[in-house]
Amino acid sequence: CYVYTPYGSQKDPSRRYPVLYLQHGVGENETGWIWQGKLNYIMDNLIAEHKCREMIVVMSCDYAFIEGEEAVFFPGDFDRELMEDLIPYVETHFPVKRGRNYRALAGLSLGSALAARSVCRHRDKFSALGMFSGVSLYDAERICTDEAEKPDVVFFSCGSREEEISRGIEDICKKMRESETLCVKKVYEGYHENA
């Protein structure tokens, strides 16, 4: 995986940061957020302009196949890898704050479906969910219909030409607002890419 750390974070080893686990889309891997998405530059600029709080961003590979099973395109064991391997590793090797209030999970396309699934399964572990061009909204909808703990905020975004996804997001946001879950929707120019 790749891990973004804020500029100067090594200067004060006692300082701890919130963490965002960020998943890629279909046909990509963890390098997409750095090479195509330029996440490191975007984060540096947002932090410098005081538009984003300092945080650590962890970008791992979605494709965690289950040993002994046929390798299917939809990663079957991502949730286990995230909860049992990735989060414990990050929390012991990087200066992150621990606990639900300091941990968020987001993804693009397929990564958004995986993020929503993991947040639904582990609501005590994540305070925020981000779905960018989310293709599977089933788990996101469960967030507002289940009685279990809800994320503090759910952020949706999509391209202006993703009309079906946009309508689905609007329906879910309405349900989330009714269940008193903060839901933010942004539409950016374009289609199904890093808008």
Each language-model region and where it sits:
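Non-catalytic cap/lid and distal C-terminal segments of serine-dependent acyl enzymes
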Residues: 1-195
